[in-house]
UniProtKB/Swiss-Prot annotation:
Family listed: Belongs to the bacterial ribosomal protein bL35 family.
GO biological process, one term: translation
Molecular function as annotated in GO: structural constituent of ribosome
Disulfide partners: none
Protein name: Large ribosomal subunit protein bL35
Lineage of producing organism: Bacteria, Bacillati, Bacillota, Clostridia, Moorellales
An example Gene Ontology CC term for this record: cytosolic large ribosomal subunit
Amino acid sequence: MPKMKTHRGAAKRLRVTASGKVKRFRAYKSHLLASKTPKQKRRLRHPALVDSTDRRRVARLLPYEA
């Protein structure tokens, strides 16, 4: 069986933690920020974890990381 290819777009956006969880960046932080409150923007700074329901989908995109 040939090697599986890593989805390069996913590899640039997602990181696997030491415990095996998948970390992602939050959306809505690139433009149109004047209308968002400072609290909203502050919360968007911190990364989030990919939901457990999407973990199998991410594992297919990142076969050697997840």
